[in-house]
């Protein structure tokens, strides 16, 4: 006999946290100036900085789709991170990005790397004598988007 359903682990216990490792990582990002840098982002959306940090945190925790960003709201996560938006809100936020906004995020990433270098020696070899070089390779995959709920969407990044 085979069961007609699959078991899916869910972290809904208010005392459990599935991704506690985000706490030191986001604290380091904050000390390197991430939150101040995100104020330069000109996306026409309220609280763009908080939404950006939520997306970054979700990606660090393994979210690879907009729906997966909901993992930041399960279990005891609201005790650790205040103001995490719903995944549908974050999806609307991400869909408002233009090419110029992506370039702004690229500049913010470069400035954040400089801030991290000042706090974590050795992130870039040779950073002390200004001869350091860092190459960060982040690949994306563009795929067709299908589905009744995806009106007016042709391509998506993954």
Segments predicted by a language model, with ranges:
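Dynamic "connector" segments at or just before major functional cores
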Residues: 1-158
């Amino acid at each position: 006999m085979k069961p007609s359903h699959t078991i899916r682990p869910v972290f809904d216990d208010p005392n459990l946290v599935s991704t506690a490792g985000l706490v030191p990582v986001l604290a380091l990002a904050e000390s390197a100036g991430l939150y101040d840098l995100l104020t330069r982002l000109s996306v026409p959306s309220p609280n763009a900085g908080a939404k950006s940090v939520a997306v970054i945190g979700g990606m660090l925790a393994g979210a690879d789709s907009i729906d997966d960003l909901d993992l930041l709201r399960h279990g005891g996560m609201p005790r650790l991170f205040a103001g995490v938006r719903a995944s549908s809100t974050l999806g609307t936020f991400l869909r408002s990005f233009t090419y110029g906004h992506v370039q702004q995020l690229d500049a913010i990433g470069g400035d954040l790397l400089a801030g991290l270098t000042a706090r974590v020696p050795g992130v870039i070899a040779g950073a002390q004598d200004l001869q350091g070089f860092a190459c960060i390779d982040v690949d994306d995959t563009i795929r067709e988007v299908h589905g009744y709920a995806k009106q007016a969407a042709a391509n998506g990044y993954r």
